[in-house]
Amino acid sequence: MDPFALRRLGRTSLELPRLGLGGASLGNIFDVIAESQADATLDAAWDAGVRFYDTSPWYGRGLSEHRIGRGLFLRPPGEAIVSTKVGRVLFAPADVAAFAASERSWPNGLQFQHRHDYSYAGVLRSYEDSLQRLRRNRVDVLVIHDLDLANLGSEELVSRHLDELDAGGGMRALEELKAAGLIKAIGAGVNRMGTIPR
């Protein structure tokens, strides 16, 4: 099996390799890694033939996207396939010191708080912010991220955010981005089957 052989993704025009680089570790999910190690990881992946990179605003509260953006910036344009996620919008904390003292999710992540937002405006804001962090004018895939009980904590919140995605226009925003050619595919990254029933 060739891990880099391309396969069509569902009914989209996008072709993906079987193997890609997941960006959670570049956001310090398991351990704090230095910038030099992040750069070396991205260089080694590229040199080994990896061209598919998956990340999220949530990974390191933007750190993973910054690192991947920096790592791909000087590579030949159009060779990398990039996937990121929507559903969380980052913003500056009102009290930076209190936030830094309480932060446990992402050690040495960027100093941003987040709010879940699957609405039309939230999806577009998340997409545009990700483009800035990734140093790109488009990404290939946008994934609806963590819209599930495991991450939101209650069925009420899951239901509310599903309503944002549906009646609040989040799905419409994704479809408009795809129709405009600004993304090639829409996905869902959840931890429970059947979470997104519509």
Task: Map each language-model feature to its residues.
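N-terminal binding-site loop/beta-alpha segment at the start of enzyme catalytic domains
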Residues: 1-99
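Glycine/proline-rich, positively charged
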Residues: 30, 103-198
